[in-house]
Amino acid sequence: MANTVKVTLIKSTNGRLANHKACVKGLGLRRIGHTVEVLDTPENRGMINKAYYLLKVEG
């Protein structure tokens, strides 16, 4: 099984930069407190790094 990372949205995307909102949406997060497991790929890591201040990452 491939490595995965748990990502949780902990802050609102209201008033944030459009590309940061797009990264959050690209990770599959919809609302505060929503948690998803994403594959640990360079593409997903890039999205996580761009919007790091809105997220909590485990794993």
Curated annotation (Swiss-Prot):
Q: Name the species this protein comes from.
A: Ectopseudomonas mendocina (strain ymp)
Fetch the InterPro entries from UniProt: Ribo_uL30_ferredoxin-like_sf, Ribosomal_uL30_bac-type, Ribosomal_uL30_ferredoxin-like
Gene3D superfamilies cross-referenced by the UniProt entry: Ribosomal protein L30, ferredoxin-like fold domain
One GO biological process this protein is involved in is: translation
Per the record, its GO cellular-component terms are:
cytosolic large ribosomal subunit
Quaternary form? Part of the 50S ribosomal subunit.
Q: Membrane: is it a keyword of this entry?
A: no
Q: Would you say which domain of life the source belongs to? A: Bacteria
Q: What does the sequence similarity comment in the record state about its family?
A: Belongs to the universal ribosomal protein uL30 family.
GO MF: structural constituent of ribosome
The keyword Ribonucleoprotein belongs to this UniProt entry's keyword annotation:
yes
| UniProtKB keywords | Ribonucleoprotein, Ribosomal protein
Q: Which SUPFAM superfamilies does the record match to this protein?
A: Ribosomal protein L30p/L7e
Protein name, UniProt field:
Large ribosomal subunit protein uL30
**PANTHER family assigned:** LARGE RIBOSOMAL SUBUNIT PROTEIN UL30M, MITOCHONDRIAL RIBOSOMAL PROTEIN L30
